[in-house]
């Protein structure tokens, strides 16, 4: 067995698990949200969008838009089109605590969340300064830089720039220093308790670092961040979700557990998440081994087919499951990565639907493995039932040569002609199905 074959065998489990780890592996569910199909020699992995309505037609429409985080660019274009039909889109993104807004029931809670938001924005300002050798001149410049790096941060940035009382944070930059300011509950300078002015300056540590590693005026620090999922996507010849979708859109809102909350819950319970640890340690042994194996199977159709079958099989097994443990996850990972993060999404959905004027339609845009739990909650809590489904092809690999594809096209065209000649009146249903196959086959002709 050659090295590439050994690598493919070694990745049979871990590669498909890596793709699912972002969304938390499989979920117990009545409806499948992932599947693999082989049609005319073409192996495809697909994810589902399911629309939920009350049987009497009243109330909200909620769509569960399942996604896999690596796929063809055309797949993500299709997903964006589906999401465009909903008034509000709730998307997953584990971010710092201050990225989810400053809403609170009391002034004390608003103050604490405003402090979290200011810390989050300052961390983005630190990233700007490290990359550019100077502070951002304005919040607008900081936003443009941040969103250019990751569009998922567009809405979190906007949320964090508004304090708990609905006023925009102040920002001043001069002489290499900067500070963020909230005037507190009373909106006026001075005050105490909840009316206390909140002022968050540039970190002194960063000032020292900047002087020690001062950049020339036009020099920029290279971005050396590594992404295991990008390397996985490159090995499969597909794209990353986060780099294929522009999240800076009206109505797109982050809905997830803050990273600090995930870690705090684990610490309080004395637990460890092997999945979170692997993903957070870029220089760890597990990631290093995965990178080594991926380098050996890059652009391998055999490897891509294996991953498609593994992902589809996981989704179909989840759809059949009616209870018990979720395959591939330990008890801790199952609870923290799926259950508790899903609870945060449902809380945000409940807030939206509880408004005096709720949105007419909401999409939950999450890893397909989360959807079974969401579906059960929609049914039990809001009486919503699945009304329609659309399957989208995330990636595929062709087993057939161009010659064989052309031969199948000719055979189907001949069959359609014979059906039409024999029974013109009843030919439509059969010919319509064959026409769809023809359309897919013609796309594969080189």
Roles of regions detected by a PLM:
Residues 23-92:
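Zymogen propeptides
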Residues 23-29, 38-41, 101-102, 203-361, ...:
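Hydrophobic, often amphipathic alpha-helical segments used for membrane interaction and targeting
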Residues 7-16:
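Bacterial N-terminal signal peptides
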Residues 111-213:
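Low-complexity, acidic interaction segments enriched in glycine
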Residues 1-7:
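Bacterial N-terminal signal peptides that target proteins for export
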Residues 46-54, 167-172, 179, 350-351:
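Short, surface-exposed beta-strand/loop micro-motifs that present aromatic residues
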Residues 72-75, 97-103, 191, 371-375:
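Extracytoplasmic/secreted cell-surface and envelope-processing proteins
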Residues 58-69, 99-105, 327-332:
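Acidic/histidine-rich, surface-exposed loop or edge segments in extracytoplasmic proteins
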